[in-house]
Regions:
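Short, non-helical or kinked segments that cap or interrupt transmembrane helices
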Residues: 29-48, 85-98, 184, 208, ...
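Alpha-helical transmembrane segments within multi-pass membrane transporters and channels
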Residues: 60-107, 269
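Extracellular/periplasmic helix-loop junction at the C-terminal end of a transmembrane helix
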Residues: 103-149, 272-282, 308-317
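Hydrophobic alpha-helical segments embedded in the membrane of multi-pass proteins
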Residues: 18-27, 43-50, 71-79, 189, ...
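Transmembrane alpha-helical segments in multi-pass inner-membrane proteins
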Residues: 227-296
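Helix-loop-helix "hairpin" substructures at the membrane interface of multi-pass membrane proteins
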Residues: 153-232, 255-256, 260
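Membrane-interfacial amphipathic/re-entrant helices at transmembrane-helix boundaries
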Residues: 1-24, 37, 51, 58-64
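Cytosolic-side transmembrane-helix boundaries in multi-pass membrane proteins
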Residues: 172, 190, 197, 201-204, ...
Length: 324
């Protein structure tokens, strides 16, 4: 029973770790399906994390924090769009530039406003954080060994943003494959000239895609600083935006396979946390440096085997111009 409990707790940790990855990966899916490379996922998440924590600490309301996080990420997304859609700049450079800018700007503003070394105040007041939602009969269900513990630990006790991320996958699949907007969005990423010939604005669709990406990155960043943690710290995204991009590529720009990739990466991250300081048979205690690198090593190995077979949208990374 103790082993089973540890497995359930590991799966619960996997869900919590997968949430920001999934939100960012679906955000990148909308953007890249429209033909815009989204290397700014990391920066948008980081900017949203700072804004959400700062506003939540200042106002005492996590909902104001969520709004600030989304607004910040959307602003950064539009900034990237202005550079690479309107002015047809290099999409990789635009995304990386925003990420580098936010990585320095967030701690600088935090130091100027709060004087806490680039951090925000701890979010320990009522209403400043997203807390777990206990579902009906969760406490009673713990007495039932298998389904009850799964219900009590996996389904119950998660915060609202986790449930939103879970609903996002079928929602994104429906939008992309069952709506006119999704059809046009995918067409822009494959053949923008055909879309333009049909009288549809290519740039307009791409801007809508990057705005959706900004909204979802805003939710992901807000989750990091107001749900997974109790405030903002420097570099708190820790490469999650790039892991989300890797999961998106591994999932071949499709919602359900991308969910599987996010869960796999999150499981290795959660497992790495559990393995720290634990003596394993034959090898003994694994060095903590190797354990921390495990999710990224797995990412490289998986992409080395699958990226060649993953077909990206044909027009991705290509600025559109009617003259060409």
């Amino acid at each position: 029973m103790e082993t089973y409990t540890l497995i359930v707790l590991l799966l619960a940790a996997t869900i919590r770790v997968a949430t920001p990855l999934l939100l960012a990966a679906i955000a990148g899916m909308f953007s890249e399906r429209a033909g815009v490379i989204d290397l700014g996922l990391e920066g948008k998440m980081l900017g949203a994390a700072f804004a959400a924590a700062a506003v939540s600490a200042s106002t005492g309301s996590v909902w104001f924090g969520l709004g600030a996080g989304i607004a910040t990420a959307v602003f950064l997304a539009v900034l990237i769009g202005f550079a690479c859609i309107t002015h047809r700049g290099n999409q990789v450079v635009a995304g990386m530039a925003v990420t580098i800018m936010v990585a320095g700007l967030g701690p600088t503003l935090g130091l100027a406003w709060f004087g806490l070394g680039g951090q925000t105040p701890q979010l320990d007041g009522a209403g400043q954080r997203f807390t777990g939602i206990v579902l009906p009969w969760a406490r009673e269900a713990r007495e039932t060994p298998v389904p009850g513990l799964l219900y009590a630990e996996l389904l119950s006790g998660q915060n609202l943003l986790v449930y939103f991320a879970a609903a996002l996958v079928p929602g994104a699949a429906w939008v992309l494959y069952r709506t006119r907007f999704g059809l046009r969005l995918r067409a822009v990423g494959e053949n923008p000239h055909a879309v333009d010939t049909a009288g549809i604005s290519v740039n307009g669709l791409r801007y809508r895609a990057v705005i959706i990406s900004g909204v979802l990155c805003g939710v992901a960043g807000t989750y990091l600083s107001t749900a997974a943690s109790a405030g903002f710290v420097r570099d708190m995204t820790a490469g999650k935006g790039y892991l989300a991009l890797a999961a998106l590529i591994f999932g071949k720009w499709k919602p359900w396979p991308t969910l599987g990739a996010c869960l796999l990466f999150a499981f290795t991250d959660a497992l790495a946390t559990r393995l720290q300081g634990v003596a394993l048979p034959v090898v003994g205690v694994v060095p903590v440096q190797f354990i921390l690198a495990l999710p990224y090593v797995l990412t490289v190995l998986l992409l080395a085997g699958f990226v060649g077979r993953a077909e990206a949208p044909r027009a991705i990374g290509s600025p559109y111009s009617k003259e060409k």
